[in-house]
Design a protein with these regions (language model features):
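Conserved SGNH/GDSL esterase-like catalytic core that processes O-acyl groups on lipids
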Residues: 35-37, 49-147
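Positively charged n-region of N-terminal signal peptides that target proteins for export
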Residues: 11-14
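Short active-site segment of divalent metal-dependent hydrolases/proteases
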Residues: 43-44
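Bacterial N-terminal signal peptides
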Residues: 17-25
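Alpha-helical cap/lid subdomain in secreted, periplasmic
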Residues: 108-221
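Short hydrophobic segments within beta-strands
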Residues: 39-40, 181
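Boundary at the C-terminal end of the N-terminal hydrophobic targeting segment
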Residues: 28-30
Length: 222
């Protein structure tokens, strides 16, 4: 009887060790996946998945008339992460945010702009920057192309702020893949500016088109 008990205890220890090894392997496998961070606006938000959680959102779990998206699994970035074998590092997206510090109604957006949040993206392997939409919609000052010696006042204009942001990101994340996602149906001055500045910093610019939208934002199909 004592031998049977000892044998049973030994088997339990072996099974426990095997289970622990399996869990450890799963965790390590998940952690070894390349990671993605997002610096974005409303197009990249979703309730419960944005850092910090005080950022304004557009997409929620509940049903809303403004959009048919009700699940994080329907968002562009979640589909990418899941289907391409990545894991999410940080999604620092803020609904209504501009790249520069000038927002809607000429308000000061220096606490929510892309350049205010670009230092809070974790340690990813890939960064997607999905912006310029609100700069276009808000009619932010376009400014001149400027690639150095930025002053505070310069960052309230789109072109200087865009260059300032990419200059920071390529130096802050030298071994990270950077991609700028350019929305469809924006002003040509914004499109031209984004492409020109991305080319200057050798950041890939992905021009989007034919996005199905509802309320000006990507739908499930979009």
């Amino acid at each position: 009887k004592q031998l049977f008990i000892n044998h049973t205890n030994a088997m339990k220890k072996i099974l426990t060790s095997l289970l622990a090894c399996c869990v450890f392997a799963i965790v390590c496998s998940a952690q070894s996946l390349p990671s993605v961070s997002i610096l974005g606006d409303s197009y990249s938000t979703f309730e419960g998945y944005v850092q910090p959680d005080t950022n304004a959102l557009w997409y929620f779990n509940k049903v809303r008339t403004q959009t048919d998206v009700t699940s994080v699994q329907q968002t562009w970035w979640h589909l990418f992460v899941k289907n391409q074998g990545y894991r999410l590092c940080v999604n620092n997206s803020f609904s209504g945010s501009t790249i520069c510090n000038t927002g809607y109604r000429n308000e000061d957006y220096s606490e929510r702009s892309f350049i205010a949040r670009m230092d809070h993206l974790g340690n990813p392997d890939v960064i997607f920057i999905f912006g310029a939409t609100n700069d276009a919609w808000a009619g932010a000052p376009i400014g001149e192309y400027q690639y150095e010696n930025w002053k505070k006042a310069d960052l309230y204009q789109f072109r200087p702020a865009m260059a300032y942001m990419l200059n920071y990101l390529v130096n802050r994340y030298p071994n990270v893949e950077l991609y700028f996602l350019l929305n469809s149906e924006l002003k040509e001055s914004i499109n031209e500016s984004v492409k020109t500045i991305c080319a200057y910093y050798k950041v890939d610019c992905i021009q989007l088109h034919d996005i199905d939208k509802k309320g000006g934002h990507p739908s499930i199909l979009g």
